[in-house]
Design a protein with these regions (language model features):
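Alpha-helical and His/Cys-centered functional microenvironments
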Residues: 7, 15, 294-296
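Leucine-biased recognition of intrinsically disordered, low-complexity hydrophobic segments
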Residues: 7-10, 19, 25, 40, ...
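Targeting/processing segments of secretory and organellar proteins
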Residues: 17-18, 23, 32-35
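Short, Lys/Arg-enriched N-terminal segments with co-localized hydrophobic residues
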Residues: 30-50
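Glycine-rich, acidic/polar active-site loops that bind/position phosphate-bearing ligands
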Residues: 51-492
């Protein structure tokens, strides 16, 4: 079926519009079937059979669950979730050929004169949205974005991650990640944060709205096929964390985007505002996205070595060394907002200095202690990212840095188990401990010089991202803040 559809579109692609097998007319610029090489269309019968099976499963689930609308989700370059809805009658056609849309108003996408885009849903991401009514139900699918000629759109962050993962796959590796996304509940979003509770780290607060919010959020995530390991109250008042089960990086990036929306939707349902802003409250801990990660070769954890004193393989050590070496230049991707750098300061358990350790949580990279019989759990934890990053781009640059370490055979420096925040500057210098960028401008300037980041993101996203962040910094630099008014107005 898929083959005949492609050939039919090929036959009619000489006309001003491209008529698909299902009778849907694409824009004149849509030449995907015409320009694709023959061997790409007919890769293998097995691949087509798998795609047809996925499509059939989606159509079956949609029918069984009385689905009437499907939301196609994707992100802009900043990781802001975008999407549009199609009716169930359009679902089969969307799975086969994608859906056309105008990308000119989406951050980092195309100009208005070249804005025709195709969103093709990934059938593996089909899930019913639980907070919508079961009658005339709504489902969601993540979509990959394509150019009118059928090639992957270089401004699509999901494609950037898929390309990075393909590079790892070509070397025999699969990246698994487990991010810890922290967030705050506030009473409203009116610009004056008001705590919902006064609990602290691991506190069992009374049965209040925050406890119920977390419970309902977890049940909603589980209903969408996203497995939760545990949840708890974090250090700051009204700060919470729900940890998702370790899985492959693409699935986790999709899950992270879903998680952020679910947290906000459930909060909104109860008249509460949830935020992933890195540092919403002065004098309190900010919210991080500590990212646990490891490489697997088949079912074997490539990071594990039973003979090493740290139970880390040479691959793991080189990967970690790559993360450490390139951490400064990827920081603008993993901590992408002006506000991110209010979190990355001493005194609030967020990393500032570039080092690694096992027990020391002031280090940038931490290796959780090995437990006998848990070889597959061997991993490293990268502690600087925050939950407001774009997970597709963040996972991509982390992986690129780690693979560069493996490729070049970087040597991992000795661990630093002392509290780096208590060290003198001379002591840090003696240990060769550098620091992360102190603000967004410094981070962007380092990224701008990075061949690794440019190569990973591709020229389009790299340039658009740099441009966007320079504008953000200029807006911040020229803004007269409340701090300045309170400090200077009475005395100057």
């Amino acid at each position: 079926m898929a083959t005949s559809g492609m050939l039919f579109a090929l036959q009619f692609s000489k006309y001003k519009g491209v008529l698909s097998r299902r009778g849907r007319l694409f824009p004149e610029s849509y030449t995907g079937f015409k320009k694709r090489p023959f061997f790409l269309i007919f890769i293998s019968l097995k691949k087509e059979e798998e795609m047809d099976k996925d499509k059939e499963n989606v159509l079956k689930m949609a029918k069984e669950n009385d689905v009437k609308f499907i939301r196609l989700w994707f992100t802009d370059i900043l990781g802001i979730l975008k999407g549009f809805a199609i009716t169930v009658d359009e679902l089969e056609g969307a799975l086969e050929e994608g859906m056309g849309f105008d990308g000119s108003s989406i951050q980092g996408y195309a100009r208005i004169d070249e804005s025709d885009m195709i969103a093709k849903p990934d059938p593996k991401t089909f899930q019913i949205i639980p907070w919508r009514p079961k009658e005339n139900a709504v489902a969601r699918m993540f979509a990959d974005i394509y150019e009118p000629d059928g090639t992957p759109y270089k401004g699509d962050p999901r494609w950037v991650l898929k390309r990075a993962l393909k590079k790892a796959q070509d070397q025999g590796y699969t990246l698994y990640v487990g991010p810890e996304l922290e967030y705050f509940y506030f009473k409203s979003s009116d610009g004056v944060p008001q705590f919902l509770d006064r609990g602290g780290y691991f506190d069992l607060t009374p049965l209040d709205v925050a406890t119920e919010l977390r419970r309902e959020t977890i049940l909603t995530l589980e209903a969408m096929g996203i497995h939760v390991e545990y949840s708890h109250h974090e250090v700051a008042p009204s700060q919470h964390e729900i940890d998702l089960r370790y899985t492959d990086a693409l699935t986790m990036a999709d899950n992270a985007m879903t998680y952020r929306l679910v947290v906000k939707e459930i909060a909104l349902k109860h008249g509460v505002y949830a935020t992933f802003m890195p540092k919403p409250i002065f004098g309190q801990n900010g919210s991080g996205m500590h990212t646990h990660q490891s490489l697997f070769k088949g079912n074997r954890n490539a990071f594990f070595d039973p003979k090493d004193e740290f139970h880390l393989s040479k691959i793991a050590k080189s990967y970690m060394a790559g993360i450490l070496k390139h951490s400064k230049e990827i920081t603008s991707i993993t901590s992408q907002w002006v506000n991110s750098y209010k979190r990355l300061v001493p005194g609030y358990e967020a990393p500032v200095y570039i080092s690694w350790a096992r027990r020391n949580r002031s280090a940038l990279v931490r290796v959780p202690m090995y437990k006998p019989g848990k070889e597959k759990a061997t991993r490293m934890e990268f502690r600087s990212p925050d939950p407001a990053c774009n997970p597709y781009l963040a996972f991509a640059v982390m992986l690129a840095a780690g693979l560069k370490g493996i490729e070049k055979g970087y040597e991992l420096p000795p661990p630093v188990e002392e509290d780096i925040f208590e060290m003198s500057e001379a002591s840090r210098k003696k240990h060769g401990i550098d620091s992360l960028p102190g603000n967004l401008l410094e981070a962007i300037q380092l990224t701008e010089k990075s061949e690794l980041v440019r190569e990973t993101l591709g020229d389009h996203i790299f340039q658009k991202f740099i441009e966007n962040k320079k504008i953000e910094w200029y807006q911040y630099r020229t803004h007269v803040s409340q701090f300045e008014l309170e400090k200077y107005l009475p005395i100057l």
